[in-house]
Amino acid sequence: MIRIPAVAGSFYEADPVRLRKQIEWSFLHDLGPKSLPSVPQNKPPQRSNRFFVVPHAGYMYSGPVAAHAYYHLSLEGSPDTVIILGPNHTGLGSYVSIWHKGKWKTPLGEVSVDDEISLELVKLTEIIDIDERAHLYEHSIEVQIPFLQYLFGQNFKIVPIVIMMQTPDVAESLAEGIYKLVSSGKKDIVVLASSDLNHYEPHDKTIEKDNLAIDEIQKLDYKGLFRVVEEKDVTACGYGPIMTVLILAKKLGKKPYVLRHATSGDTSGDKSSVVGYLSVRFGD
């Protein structure tokens, strides 16, 4: 089965030439790394940065912030498999849904789903349903793929997982399953937590609320992040994916490094109602 892009032409350019230019614009932007990535031919023997938080809005808004995560990912070469955890914005499908086989198509080509890792995760966690419906119109995973294709071509596979039930218990179960796969060493696996931060408040208020969440991320405190989201009304859409990578980072002794925090107002100039964006790497 081939998953057809749902947001090409809206969240990012539908033309492949213009899309590559848009991705390069993201890397070179003042809010981005200000440099194009260069992927090494020979990977280091041990990957340091295995987990990332990356935003998922339209590239014209969040592309420069997202580019920071991808720049650091590029430094250690192409992984075998990228597990992409995203929130469910559509309400379709199961509580935790995986697209377990086939290919995902973007203007830059097709990328294969790692069916082996997908089925292993389903068995290990016992909370993931094989369910394509949740993915049909969901953008949180789709918008990550062109960045990955720009860096690595077709030399990687993906495991797309959409999370509707974003609770600490679900994050713990997902993290435990992913941890077993990563620590087995059978494949070089990277995990992306796709999330924006606070939504649709003035710039200063969004920065204030985002910082509450960022404080918990820097402490690797997934329950603290959940508490802040619930009690302080921080409207981060993908806190479930973030909680999962916080647990993984702690289990594998990785430290959080905030790469860039900004809002849509920083790129659009309109700071009256913005969305917060964050890139974080978890490494040695």
From Swiss-Prot:
PANTHER family: PROTEIN MEMO1
Listed CDD domains: MEMO_like (cd07361)
NCBIfam families xref list: AmmeMemoSam_B, PRK00782.1
UniProt name for this protein: MEMO1 family protein Saci_0089
Transmembrane segments: none
Family of this protein: Belongs to the MEMO1 family.
Pfam families linked to this entry: Memo (PF01875)
Disulfide pairings: none
